[in-house]
From Swiss-Prot:
Gene symbol of the encoding locus: lpxD
Family that this chain belongs to: Belongs to the transferase hexapeptide repeat family. LpxD subfamily.
Swiss-Prot/TrEMBL keywords: Acyltransferase, Lipid A biosynthesis, Lipid biosynthesis, Lipid metabolism, Repeat, Transferase
Protein name stated in the entry: UDP-3-O-acylglucosamine N-acyltransferase
GO MF, any single term: N-acyltransferase activity
Organism: Porphyromonas gingivalis (strain ATCC 33277 / DSM 20709 / CIP 103683 / JCM 12257 / NCTC 11834 / 2561)
Pathway(s) of this molecule: Bacterial outer membrane biogenesis; LPS lipid A biosynthesis
GO cellular component: membrane
């Protein structure tokens, strides 16, 4: 598959600065550019690579002004990173789509399979499940009873979807993810712990992507809900009765305790932890390893554990390394004050 720089610019509503006829057939990082490749520059930290890259063309922002002469062809677009995503989606859509049911797969007779659906080797589709047009179930996927899988959704190898759960259209769920396992619900008693049956389900709305080995637990009752457009990295844990608002993104190892709720357009760094029964507003940003113990207002940016406003945390981080010396100084001052008090007391007599 090959395109000229001009064809790419036309598709992206951009403009060419250089050779519009240069032919491109692959992508490469700007620092590892090769002949015939397209790279991109969206971060100023990588600008110096532009002047030495071997890539034949580079996507840049419309307002980019080079500080040195550029030998490669530039394709100017409003947003280089977004344009790269758009272009790579186009290329990905041109790949041949798998279709048909492998002879080793099991599909219950009650399931109506669309003609263009793919069910891979040793996949298992249970009674009453519903599969949308163009969905793909890779080898060893398990789809439980009454599960609904939307149009164009992809379940990669070893994904497990428990009974009664719903997955929307155009979702991508990566290998090893478990949707709808029992929530961590136990009632303590004199003899130990009694299991609380988890009778709800999980609802995943359209255009959600879920990383490898992520677990989303079914609700005690009602539903655990992942709203439209959410993106979850690998190894994320979402407990029973939680909800994640539309277009929120979680980096790896985020953990939500039960019945916590996150708003729309939030961004959580890696290893963020939420205690149970709290609410996080819309457009909240949490730095890596932030721990939340209480509700958070919309628009907040927090860091640390427990989470505190970013500016306060940055100030505190300057002080933390000095605490041992400060403690010694305080002890010395307390000793001197005590001695002064004793002197004053003796002088009175």
């Amino acid at each position: 598959m090959e395109f000229t720089a001009q064809q790419i610019a036309d598709f992206l509503h951009g403009s060419v600065e250089g050779n519009p006829k240069v032919r491109l057939h692959d992508f490469a990082k700007i620092e590892e550019g090769r002949s015939g490749c397209l790279s991109f520059l969206a971060n100023a930290k990588y600008e110096h690579y532009l002047y030495q890259t071997q890539s034949d063309a580079v996507l840049v922002n419309q307002d980019f002004e080079p500080r040195e002469s550029v030998k490669t062809t530039l394709i100017r677009v409003p947003n280089a990173y977004a344009a790269l995503a758009q272009l790579m989606q186009l290329v990905d859509s041109m790949k041949p789509q798998r279709k048909g049911v492998d002879s080793t797969a099991f599909v219950h007779p009650s399931v109506i399979l669309p003609d263009d659906c793919y069910v891979g080797a040793f996949a298992y589709v249970s009674e009453g499940a519903s599969l949308g047009t163009g969905c793909s179930l890779y080898p060893h996927v398990y789809v439980g009873s009454g599960v609904s899988v939307g149009e164009g959704t992809i379940l990669y190898p070893h994904v497990t979807v428990y009974d009664g759960c719903s997955i929307g259209s155009r979702c991508v769920i990566h290998s090893g993810a478990v949707i709808g396992a029992d929530g961590f619900g136990f009632a303590p008693n004199a003899e130990g712990y009694s299991k609380i049956p988890q009778l709800g389900n999980v609802i995943i709305e359209d255009d959600v992507e879920i990383g490898a080995n992520t677990c989303i637990d079914r609700a005690v009752m009602d539903s655990t809900i992942i709203h439209r457009g959410v993106k979850l990295d690998n190894l994320v844990q979402i407990a029973h009765n939680c909800s994640v608002g539309s277009h929120t993104v979680f980096a790896a190892q985020v953990g939500m305790a039960g019945s916590s709720h996150v708003g729309e357009w939030c961004q959580f760094g890696g290893q963020v932890g939420l205690s149970g029964h709290i609410k996080v507003g819309d457009r909240v940003s949490l730095g890596g390893q932030t721990g939340l113990l209480s509700n958070v207002k919309s628009g907040s940016t927090l860091l640390g554990s427990p989470g505190m406003p970013l500016r306060d945390m940055l100030r505190a981080s300057v002080i933390f390394p000095k605490l041992p010396d400060m403690s010694l100084r305080i002890e010395q001052l307390e000793k001197e004050i005590s001695e002064l008090k004793e002197i004053c007391k003796n002088n009175k007599h």
